[in-house]
Design a protein with these regions (language model features):
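Small-aliphatic-rich amphipathic alpha-helix that forms the alpha element of a beta-alpha
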Residues: 30-35, 103, 109, 119-178
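Short, hinge-like loop/turn segments at secondary-structure boundaries
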Residues: 67-68, 182-184
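Short, acidic Gly/Pro/Ser/Thr-rich loop/turn segments
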Residues: 110-113, 198-200
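A short secondary-structure junction signal
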Residues: 114-118, 169, 202
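N-terminal amphipathic, basic helical "cap/leader" segment at the start of enzyme domains
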Residues: 1-108, 112, 217-219
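Generic beta-strand structural signal
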Residues: 99-101, 160, 187-189
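C-terminal helix-cap and adjacent tail motif
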Residues: 2-14, 186-219
Length: 219
């Protein structure tokens, strides 16, 4: 049952760096299956997924620094900020440094169009993400689709006893990602992959989500 699978998800604070490396072929298989089952508005998929593997620790370190610096800036406006906090160091992002694989999802200008889409375009149908201006206006759609892709990948990974975690604590603006030469569009979502060592559920004992009635309103 998919419900039982999804219940097993746990946010990883830190991955086991001594665990056996997950085969690249297994990750590719999961990614292909995720791509296959993930829907997209008009089948345009105006986003892309960059896969950082075990051999590119330098890229993971760069992403860790981007997230930590963003945290420094975000928390600085809180009047109750932690005075003992060490700038540039955040254990919440240890999963980025210690993961085996890191997924970086970004926007993508749609195209080339398939035969059906081209016919529709020629008949006057406008695809937002097929133009630069329209792509900028498609941010919400792109974020939703990346979230669906991430959730699908996570579910498939759980079936293989592989852990995943999401990170959204960063600025997606390209100027902050210049150290990664392959990033040329705004970043939308980060996902880490590996075998967990420390999990948030085991560290934080009293952090419940808002109750069902607060979130779901039956009209």
């Amino acid at each position: 049952m998919i419900y039982e699978v999804l219940k097993k998800h746990k946010h990883v604070m830190e991955y086991d760096e001594e665990a056996d490396i997950i085969k690249k072929s297994d990750i590719v298989d999961l990614l292909k299956k995720t791509w296959e089952i993930t829907p997209s508005k008009n089948n345009l998929m105006p986003w892309q997924v960059f896969v950082i593997g075990p051999d590119n620790q330098n890229y993971k370190n760069i992403v860790y620094n981007i997230c930590s610096k963003n945290e420094d800036i975000a928390n600085s406006v809180n009047e109750y900020k932690d005075n003992d906090y060490i700038k540039g160091r955040n254990p919440a992002y240890a999963n980025i440094k210690s993961c085996q694989y890191l997924l970086i999802m970004t926007q993508r200008l749609s195209g080339p169009l398939n035969a059906y889409q081209q016919k529709q375009w020629d008949n006057g149908v406008f695809y937002d993400s097929y133009t630069e201006e329209g792509l900028a206006d498609s941010e919400n759609t792109i974020c939703i689709e990346c979230g669906i892709f991430g959730a699908n990948f996570s579910a498939l990974a759980i079936e293989k006893e592989i852990d995943t975690s999401y990170t959204l604590c960063f600025t997606g603006k390209i100027k902050y990602w210049k150290e990664l030469p392959f990033i040329n569009r705004p970043v939308t979502l980060l996902m880490t992959i590996g075998h967990g060592k420390k999990y948030r559920k085991n560290i934080i004992f009293n952090d419940p989500k808002p109750n069902f009635e607060r979130i779901v309103k039956l009209i």
